[in-house]
């Protein structure tokens, strides 16, 4: 049975007993968790807080920003800029990196985040979330640039997400497995509710936007066609489809009971490797999924091995239960 300990105690034990995290990283993760609590409050207020609807602007991706996108982005920046652990931050909602102002001490860590994933679901009261990734600045040179962020996902020192749903749940890895914390609203604290999260190697569930099927590459078409044939087809078992249109919600379900999440290449935008962003969506989720015993690829390569060339780089994603990810990836490799 999982010990009901606080996030602070969990992180202190990771630091003290296992030597997994330095003190500055522990403090950084606690600040990110506090910021997620603040975002949860804004999400829960909804129409009463005047936070629903469009902000009338676009982000660097050309996507219309919701009011909560901007609020969540500001909360994360303001919470983290002054603590002394960070050198800079990067976000889906910002064109370029945000360097910690000179009036605050600069640390050695880099924080990347999607402040509010699944924001198309905000106005209809469906689960959304925050995704974050932590890297360590590799160079000893003064200052920080975009180049410092361009590290493969395997270099992450921590990653997590917070899902704002019926419960507010924080999922975290520091490279020593995956733990889930539930927000106790009466106490205002994060409480460990699941440790040693494991994703089953086999599954009968897949998550993908089937309305785009005609635009996918043949290997992805083949994989889905076989799933849809069920027990009468080559797979010999029936599958169920799930799709929330929020990566956080779909991946959280996979962590809880297995499944495979796919956001494949689309021939309507052939020059783009995929839809999801590598640095602050695919990498942190890939790290979490691998730490829980799953797998994450772009169809041909392990996501965490990809070397980014730009901050907002996009990528195809197949992640979740190991055997299904391997099958879908094998079809891509066979196709060349």
Curated annotation (Swiss-Prot):
Gene Ontology molecular-function annotations: fructose 1,6-bisphosphate 1-phosphatase activity; magnesium ion binding
Subcellular location field: Cytoplasm
Organism the protein comes from: Methylibium petroleiphilum (strain ATCC BAA-1232 / LMG 22953 / PM1)
Cofactor binding mode and count: Binds 2 magnesium ions per subunit.
Protein name as catalogued: Fructose-1,6-bisphosphatase class 1 2
Assigned keywords, A-Z: Calvin cycle, Carbohydrate metabolism, Cytoplasm, Hydrolase, Magnesium, Metal-binding
Pathway(s) this gene product operates in, as recorded in its UniProt entry: Carbohydrate biosynthesis; Calvin cycle
EC assignment: 3.1.3.11
């Amino acid at each position: 049975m999982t010990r009901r300990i606080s996030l602070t105690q969990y992180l202190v034990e990771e630091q003290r007993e296992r030597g997994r995290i330095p003190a500055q990283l522990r403090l950084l993760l606690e600040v990110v968790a506090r910021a997620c609590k603040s975002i949860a409050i804004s999400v829960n207020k909804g129409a009463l807080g005047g936070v629903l609807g469009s902000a009338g602007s676009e982000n660097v991706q050309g996507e219309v920003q919701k009011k909560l996108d901007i609020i969540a982005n500001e909360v994360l920046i303001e919470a983290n800029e002054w603590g002394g652990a960070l050198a800079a931050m990067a976000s889906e909602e910002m064109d370029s990196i945000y360097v910690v102002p000179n009036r605050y001490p600069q640390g050695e860590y880099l924080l990347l985040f999607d402040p509010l994933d699944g924001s198309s679901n905000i106005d209809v009261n469906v689960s959304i979330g925050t995704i974050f990734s932590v890297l360590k600045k590799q160079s000893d040179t003064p200052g920080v640039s975009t180049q410092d962020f361009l590290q493969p996902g395997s270099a992450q020192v921590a990653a997590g997400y917070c899902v704002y749903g019926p419960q507010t749940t924080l999922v975290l890895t520091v490279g020593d497995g995956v733990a889930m914390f539930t927000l106790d609203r009466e106490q205002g604290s994060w409480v460990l509710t699941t440790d040693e999260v494991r994703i089953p190697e086999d599954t009968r569930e897949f998550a993908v936007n089937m309305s785009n099927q005609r635009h996918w590459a043949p290997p992805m078409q083949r994989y889905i066609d076989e799933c849809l044939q069920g027990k009468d087809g080559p797979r010999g078992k029936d599958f169920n489809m799930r799709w929330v249109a929020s990566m956080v919600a779909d991946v959280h379900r996979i962590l809880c009971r297995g499944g495979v999440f796919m956001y494949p290449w689309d021939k309507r935008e052939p020059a783009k490797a995929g839809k999801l962003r590598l640095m602050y969506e695919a990498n942190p989720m890939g790290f979490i999924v691998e730490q829980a015993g799953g797998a994450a690829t772009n169809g041909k390569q392990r996501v965490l091995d990809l070397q980014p060339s730009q901050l907002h780089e996009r990528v195809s994603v197949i992640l979740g239960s190991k055997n299904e990810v391997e099958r879908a990836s094998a079809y891509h490799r066979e196709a060349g």
